[in-house]
Amino acid sequence: MALSPLAGKPAPKELLIDPAQLEREYYTRAPDPSDPAQQVSFGTSGHRGSPLRGSFNEAHIVATAQAMCEYRQAQGITGPHFIGRDTHAVSILAQRTALEVLAANGVEIVIQSDDEFTPTPALSRAILVHNRGRTDRLADGVVVTPSHNPPEDGGFKYNPPNGGPADTDATGWIQRRANELLREGNRSAKRIPLAAAQRAANYHEQDFRMPYVQDLRHVIDMEAIRAAGLKLAVDPLGGAAVHYWEPINSVYGLDIDVVNPRVDPTFAFMTVDHDGKIRMDSSSPYAMASLLGLKDRFQLAFANDTDADRHGIVTPSTGLLNPNHYLTVAIHYLLNARPQWRRDAAIGKTLVSSSMIDRVVAAAGRRLLETPVGFKWFAPGLLDGSVCFGGEESTGASFLRQDGTVWTTDKDGIILALLAAEITARTGKEPGQYYWDLTTQFGTPHYTRIDAPATPEQKARLGKLSPDAVRASSLAGEPITAKLTRAPGNDQPIGGLKVVTENGWFAARPSGTENLYKIYAESQRDTRHLQTLVAEAQQIVAESLRS
């Protein structure tokens, strides 16, 4: 995909959304239930869409919230329902709609007091704290967020009582019922006016923020960061964590400069992403251009996306740290710095993450759990302590408390940012330097991800390939040692293909939102070998789809 001439530059006025137009479209546009693009569709992070495309409108949220209430009843979930939102313009609208439906269904609602924002990890933690030691009246929740997606988008993400992203059984149930309701015009959905919902006996306000902040000492060595006197910076990218960082400063005596405290639903302060869109992606050097420009003023800087489940780490030596590099550093450090963690607890990684992680885990004598893409696969293990760290190459991760018990079962960009500061404080090396030291022991892998065009039919075939569809016996001059369509760690379908050789691998997966597929590839040799891997990967995928 060609790089936009606007990439990395301040967003021009022409790119800014009109929040009033979004609100009108949200309430007045009626989706077409016969159009798949306008139906409720749960991906790896809930239902997403835009009022402007007829894919995230009031009708969708009425249907989804009602379906969720019915799912709770079917599953015997009778405890409180925690609901939070990020800073996207549509999020507050969808949250209000959901409150009207939840209250009408008699669900016990718990919402952040003072109409404040709620990061995904704070909500996950709140669910787990409520459910600790309980066997009945278990809590669940929703975060209204499209994550780092553009300002015109909305999202609705369900977290069951395990606190993590819902599994496909739950999302499939809710999606099917929501679309039934959508087709019938939501006639069977229950709903009361917002004012009545907020006066109802089952509506409660609670502070999620300070309990989360005060509990951080049990997952991060905050005293080490304070004692080191590190000069730190954070850019919340206008997201839900924006009002968490000053309390973290004051509670722990840290020196974190919140360089951009603005909240603006147009996200006019952002620099433009690679494709010419505004996107609050903390892993993109283009979206992170403003913070990168400040890298030499601080010993370490970091950012989160709008629901704070992702992280971006900026160091003076490397600039924006490659997500795979930081995952490797975090895992290596934690396996040496958390002696109370169970020795048999696994490190969870998705199969498109770097194989450098495999080598670090093997050298530590620990178990690797390689899963399909999606943080939901790590949630059960994080909950019971059988997984001590779970991470995705898309900059989402979480890990256990220092005592080896659960912290969150959803991604937590705040603790990954603070972990970078802990690593710097306790080792004297910022994460960029730490990674390059690791390469002297484990080698220097070369990794890339590219997009390739695909029709909807080709995407569907790619998602259902069998290993037999790959006829090639070699890749980039080496014998193929594995052809995978199911993940080694849990034998779940990967929704694509992974091909492995001694010194390289590639994986191909269809995009969930665009007519393209993604190729991930890594070489243990050099960039030329990587280029050959990618070229042959495209040939193998094309031949497999034809067959």
Regions picked out by a protein language model, each given a short descriptive name:
Residues 2-38, 134-135, 152-294:
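Gly/Ser/Thr-enriched, mixed-charge loops and adjacent short helices
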Residues 13, 20, 77-153, 247-312:
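N-terminal small/polar loop signature for handling phosphorylated ligands or for N-terminal nucleophile
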Residues 37-56, 146-149, 236-247, 306-308, ...:
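Conserved phosphate/anionic-ligand binding catalytic regions in large, soluble enzymes, centered on
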Residues 50-51, 80-86, 231-234, 314, ...:
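Short glycine-rich or small-residue beta-strand-to-loop segments that form or flank ligand, phosphate
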Residues 65-81, 221-228, 295:
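Glycine-rich phosphate/diphosphate-binding loops that line cofactor/substrate pockets in enzymes
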Residues 112-117, 176-207, 315-391, 396-399:
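Proline/glycine-rich low-complexity loops and linkers
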Residues 300, 337-520, 526-547:
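Phosphate-binding and adjacent anionic-ligand microenvironments
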